[in-house]
Regions:
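Elongated, amphipathic alpha-helical interaction scaffolds
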Residues: 1-244
């Protein structure tokens, strides 16, 4: 298999014969170039595709990869494996310095005893809920962009409101402007003690305020149960102030 398909002219014939016309018309087979089909995952475990070719698009504006895998026994999850190889090829393309993802066309060469090939070649059909998978993987992914959500709307977000308010305003020149809002959100008892402690430490370490002690006191008015923690932080701020002075 590899002796044949690693030969450029043979690979050109194979793709010209077996690629659907709609895909073939976007490929410039004259620019076909054999690539390494070995990939290494984050856990350093290597995996290999059979054949990987790169080529320019017919318009010359981008790159297309043809990933050819051969199989003698049907595999229910073959399309998922092909997707893993395809995404690995995309990542390698970016690692080379390209700014846009290439289209990777997986092609399965099957020569098993069972005929015809018994499984769908649509990888979405591998999911227990193909309809949901199609909605997730063929549309835009959900986006929680807090930069465009109003503070009033964020204030209604129950246990996530403190986190969203912090992250939205952490780069403000003075966090004092949202101290009251944060204090009220913390007082609603949606959050765990660990979450509130982490929030206070984060605000004072990563945020900016011209009056850090007043900021602490404002929060303390709403969450007096954290007085000990607040006083510890306030004492630290006083010491830092003396050192800076």
């Amino acid at each position: 298999f590899k002796t044949y398909l690693t030969h450029k002219a043979t690979a050109q014939d194979f793709l010209q014969i077996h690629l659907p016309p709609m895909l073939l018309q976007g490929c410039n087979l004259a620019t076909l170039k054999l690539e390494s089909g070995s990939f290494v995952e984050e856990n350093l475990r290597a995996f290999y595709s059979d054949i990987l070719y790169s080529m320019q698009t017919a318009s010359g504006k981008g790159y297309i990869y043809a990933l050819i895998e051969h199989q003698s026994s049907p595999d229910q999850h073959m399309t998922f494996r092909l997707m893993r190889y395809a995404i690995a090829a995309m990542q390698r393309h970016l690692d080379k310095g390209h700014s846009q993802l290439p289209v990777v066309i997986p092609v399965l060469f099957y020569h098993g005893i069972k005929s015809p090939y018994p499984f769908s070649m649509n990888w979405l059909h591998s999911f227990s809920d193909p309809q949901l998978a199609q909605q997730v993987y063929t549309g835009s992914f959900p986006l929680a962009d807090i930069t465009v959500i109003s503070d009033d709307d964020i204030d209604k977000h129950r246990s996530i409101a403190v986190l969203e308010t912090m992250q939205k305003h952490i780069r403000d020149r003075d966090l004092m402007a949202v101290a009251g809002t944060l204090g009220r959100q913390m007082s609603r008892r949606y959050n765990t003690q660990e979450q509130l402690k982490s929030s206070m430490e984060y605000l004072l370490e990563a945020g900016e305020t011209e009056a850090p002690l007043r900021f602490v006191r404002t929060l303390l008015q709403h969450v007096p149960q954290h007085e000990e923690l607040m006083m510890t932080i306030a004492q630290k701020l006083r010491q830092e102030g003396r050192q800076e002075g």
